[in-house]
A protein has these predicted regions:
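Soluble metallo-hydrolase cores and metallopeptidase-like ectodomains found primarily
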Residues: 26, 108, 119-150, 235-339, ...
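Bacterial N-terminal signal peptides that target proteins for export
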Residues: 1-11
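N-terminal hydrophobic or amphipathic helices/low-complexity stretches enriched
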Residues: 21-78, 249, 253-256, 260, ...
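Acidic/histidine-rich catalytic neighborhood of metal-dependent amide-processing enzymes
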Residues: 181-187, 208, 329-401
Length: 401
């Protein structure tokens, strides 16, 4: 919280200097900033009841309206053509059709059908209908990092293969732990897909498998979110993204696909935690058939847009933009991703900045934008740029938190 207060103070000084205002009001504006107010707003927006402010969701819409109400209370004015603080963004939501989706494994030992959400979950980003069938290739950790003396792929041809990899909980100090380790699974999956794999199935960690079993949990339903090209203001088509199939599987399904016992699977995780490689191998005598079907629906979300009109008759036609995103990642099984730091802190900091700027109106106008759908592909910021309520050429600077 102390860091947030320092950041707000720094931005206020920068904005009032850039936008132009006299020292005395500037001092009063800075003194209006309250750590208690920052904490109050953050405790509300990052509470479990907001369920991680996923896009789109009722909780995110409530968060947007909360910001709009507070912006008005702190003296900001609406800037949008309809006189509101809420810039509605049309969305296209792609979801997996559980009734038509089928996943089965055929082998000499018999056929086995797996069930969506219970046995496996599909990653939402880039979700599209797909039919994938073939033999399984197991790649252990599935990491190619020659600089760290670790390469599970080598010269293997991954074209049109269904790849299975493990997601171990690597201990602190592990040779493969890096500052980006939380995204290690995603980076590995994309690397394998870029090298030609049909699909990448990641076996969940032992700790996560235990939570599934103990609490009777299921995977999070898959969905992809993009701008609805038929909606108002969304004239540009969605960004083209390659359709890919990335899924997570539980340990029972992994044991069947790999032809190993649960104990053998556990020993693989143990080896990786110790820093030992698990040999890659092709699973012969079996064929995995995955038919993924999707449904599309429209929805909406909101940017929150407000402004402080500049006090100088000429300079008020120049604009300084301040922005942060107020959406986050939602939930994963029983866990809420509260998003206090990403980006609840920036979101509430802007409220305090708004209050300060209403006390010391700068010479230039200041536009404040709380973006939405950032975590789903920067859709809120893109929509704002395409439907900017002020001339883009008149924007002097932008500060993002």
């Amino acid at each position: 919280m102390k860091r947030s207060v320092r950041w707000v103070l720094s931005v206020c000084v920068a904005i009032t200097t850039l936008a132009g205002c006299s020292p005395s009001p500037q001092r009063q504006a800075v003194e209006s900033i309250s750590g208690a107010d920052l904490k109050l707003h953050l405790d509300i927006l990052a509470a479990d009841e907001f369920r991680g402010r996923d896009t789109p969701s009722p909780e995110l819409k409530i968060a947007s309206r909360y910001l709009a109400v507070m912006a008005e209370r702190y003296g900001l004015k609406p800037l949008l053509p309809d006189g509101s603080f809420l810039q509605e963004i049309p969305l296209m939501v792609t979801e997996l059709d559980a009734l038509r989706t089928q996943v089965s494994f055929r082998s000499s030992g018999g056929d086995r059908e797996f069930f969506y959400l219970r046995d496996y979950g599909v990653q939402g980003r880039g979700l599209a209908s797909a039919r994938v069938a073939g033999r399984v290739l197991f790649l252990g950790l599935g990491l190619s990092a020659p600089d760290q003396d670790w390469d599970d792929i080598g010269a293997l041809d991954l074209k049109d293969r269904i790849v299975v990899i493990l997601d171990p909980d690597l201990p602190e100090g592990h040779a493969l732990m890096t500052a980006e380790s939380p995204r290690l699974v995603r980076r590995r999956s994309w690397t394998l897909l870029q090298r030609g794999a049909y699909a990448v199935l990641t076996v969940v960690s032992e700790a996560r498998e235990e939570r599934f079993r103990e609490k009777g949990l299921q995977f999070r339903p898959a969905r992809d979110v993009s701008l609805d090209p038929t909606g108002p203001g969304a004239s540009a088509p969605p960004v083209s993204r390659r359709s890919t199939l990335r899924a997570e599987i539980r340990h029972d399904m992994a044991s069947v696909l790999l032809g190993v016992s649960r104990d053998e699977l556990s020993s693989m995780f143990s080896a990786l935690r110790k820093g030992d490689r698990v040999p890659a191998r092709e699973i012969r005598g079996g064929r995995l058939d995955m038919r993924i079907e999707t449904l599309k629906r429209t929805d909406s979300t909101y940017n929150v847009v407000a402004w402080v009109e500049g006090s100088d008759e000429q300079l008020k036609n120049e604009y300084v933009l301040i922005g942060s995103h107020h959406d986050h990642l939602g939930m994963q099984e029983d866990r809420v991703f509260n998003g206090a730091d990403d980006n609840g802190s920036g979101t509430v900091a802007m409220l305090e900045i708004a209050q300060a700027l209403s006390i010391a109106r700068p010479k230039r106008s200041v536009v404040m934008v709380w973006h939405t759908a950032e975590e789903k592909g920067l859709w809120g910021s893109r929509f704002f740029v395409e439907n900017c309520p002020v001339p883009v050429a008149k924007i002097s600077a932008q500060i993002l938190s």
